Structure formats: C-alpha cells, structure tokens
C-alpha cells in the first residue's frame, strides 16, 4: 500500500514539512487546512511544491460541522463546502475529509445526514471530487464508524465514501468485524494512529497523546487484520496529534512514521 502522513503530524512551516515528508519516503501528504492557511504560498504554489517533491496530496482536511445542520444554517454549510472544493481544484487533490458534526445546533438523524451527503456528492461529482466521511469519537450524533458507514450506505453516491481512523475506532473498543463488511471501494482512505492507555476525555486524549503505530497500547494489528479482510489497497496515512512530535525534530519523526507503516 502507498503511505501518507498529515502535515499536522510534524512541526515546521508547510515547506519544511513537505521537504521532511518527501525525504522520509512517503508517497503522499494530507494537507491540514491550518498549515495551508498559515503559509504564504498560493494553492497553485503548494501544488507545485508537493509535485516537485515527488508527492501527491492525498486529501484536504478537515471540514467540520457539515451534516445535519438546521435549515437556516444548511445553505452556509454547502457554501463552505463549495469554497473548499475550489481550493482543492487549485491544489490538485480530489479527496476531502468531512468529520462528523460536533456543533450543538446540529440535528440528528441518519436519513437527514445521508440526504446531505447525497446532495454534496452531486456537487462534488461535477468537480471530480470525492467526499470522505469520518466518525469522530466525540461527534454529537455520529461517533462510531458503523453509523458513519450507514450514512454513506444510505447516501448511495459514488463520490461519497467513508474514512476510517484507527484511533476513533479503537479508543471506543468498537467491534472490528464491522470494518470487514465495508466494501473496499467505499473506503476512501485509512488513517492510522496508536496511543497509550489513558482514562481521559476522548478529545483531549486524541489531540495530545497519539503516537506512531506500534508505539502505544491500541490493538493496531487487529485493526489492520480487519482492514485486510475488506481487500482495501489504498493509502495508509498517519494522522498524529502529539505535543512532543510538534516540537521535536521533524525529519526524524517523519522517518519514524514511515518506518512504522512498513514494519
């Protein structure tokens, strides 16, 4: 499988991160929106930077608080999506990560969310963009990949799929057999992260204590075995939120990350 890493996983400017990621031998890079917004390069310049380093942009993320918004906020959610699609076209990437809604004003309902994703899929299709939906472990209504998959299944759109993140699944001890039943073609990308065992708020645990696969206590190998049973052969991408990584030597951390995916 090809390997990728999110820019949020290491420190430095966007240029420095891209350089370190390429030197470590990754095939692709997830562009984290904050890294994009805080750099002084245009989208087309970022596109050139990535390609000049022999990488491809595996996805653009995150897009928050999209699905299930009340009517008076729904149009704005779609307008925000369209603006992100415009940026993605300039970056030359075709996958956006939409994480499950955490807004207090969002509404529940599998069918409501599925309808939102079908409509967004139609807009994305016009631009040859794919929409990947990820269940955050702390999402207001959707906090389990099984529910995210049900939304994707009901949306029934070729441009809408699921994004699996090992932390969100394993931190909640969700039955891994539920992964094996997802069609490989509907898994748009897989993000990997391990973590030490902690009894703490899921959001805080995720934002500060993730680490490389094999360096924590989560059953990553079991997750990978379940993934293998789907026949998935797309990107494996690291998404590591860790305070020490964000202040440590980026080139070494990038190399360690690459090693964790191929060992």
Regions found by a protein language model. Give the residues of each.
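Short acidic, glycine/proline-enriched helix-loop-strand junctions
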Residues: 38-57, 129, 213
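Conserved beta-strand positions in the central sheet of alpha/beta enzyme cores
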Residues: 30, 59-61, 97, 132, ...
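Active-site acidic/histidine proton-transfer and metal-coordination neighborhood
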Residues: 15, 52, 67-162
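Acidic-and-aromatic substrate-binding clefts and catalytic sites of carbohydrate-active enzymes
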Residues: 7-15, 31-43, 65-75, 103-108, ...
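Histidine-acidic metal/acid-base catalytic patches
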Residues: 1-4, 11-24, 51, 92, ...
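Catalytic-core regions built around general acid/base machinery
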Residues: 42-53, 116-124, 178, 222-226
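Short, conserved active-site loops that position catalytic residues or coordinate cofactors/metal ions
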Residues: 24-33, 59-65, 100
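Residue-level detector of anion-binding/catalytic polar loops
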Residues: 27-28, 56, 94, 130, ...
């Amino acid at each position: 499988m090809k390997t990728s890493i999110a820019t949020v996983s290491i420190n430095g400017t966007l240029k420095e991160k891209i350089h370190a990621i390429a030197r470590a031998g990754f095939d692709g890079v997830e562009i984290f929106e904050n890294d994009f917004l805080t750099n002084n390069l245009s989208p087309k310049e970022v596109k050139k930077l990535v390609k000049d380093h022999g990488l491809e942009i595996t996805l653009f993320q995150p897009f928050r608080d999209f699905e299930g918004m009340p009517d008076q906020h729904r149009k704005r959610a779609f307008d925000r999506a369209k603006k992100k699609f415009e940026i993605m076209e300039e970056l030359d990437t075709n996958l956006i990560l939409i994480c499950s809604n955490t807004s207090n004003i969002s509404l529940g309902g599998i069918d409501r969310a599925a309808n939102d994703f079908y409509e967004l899929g139609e807009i994305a299709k016009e631009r040859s963009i794919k929409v990947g939906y990820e269940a955050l472990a702390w999402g207001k209504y959707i906090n389990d990949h099984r529910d995210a998959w049900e939304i994707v299944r009901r949306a029934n759109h070729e441009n809408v799929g699921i994004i699996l993140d090992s932390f969100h699944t394993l931190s909640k001890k969700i039955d891994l057999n539920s992964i094996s039943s997802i069609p490989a073609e509907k898994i748009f990308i897989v993000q990997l992260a391990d973590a030490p065992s902690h009894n703490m708020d899921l959001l805080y645990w995720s934002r500060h204590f993730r680490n490389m696969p094999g360096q924590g206590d989560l059953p990553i190998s079991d997750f990978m075995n379940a993934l293998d049973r789907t026949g998935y052969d797309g990107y494996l991408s690291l998404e590591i939120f860790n305070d020490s990584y964000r202040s440590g030597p980026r080139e070494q951390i990038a190399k360690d990350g690459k090693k964790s995916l191929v060992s």
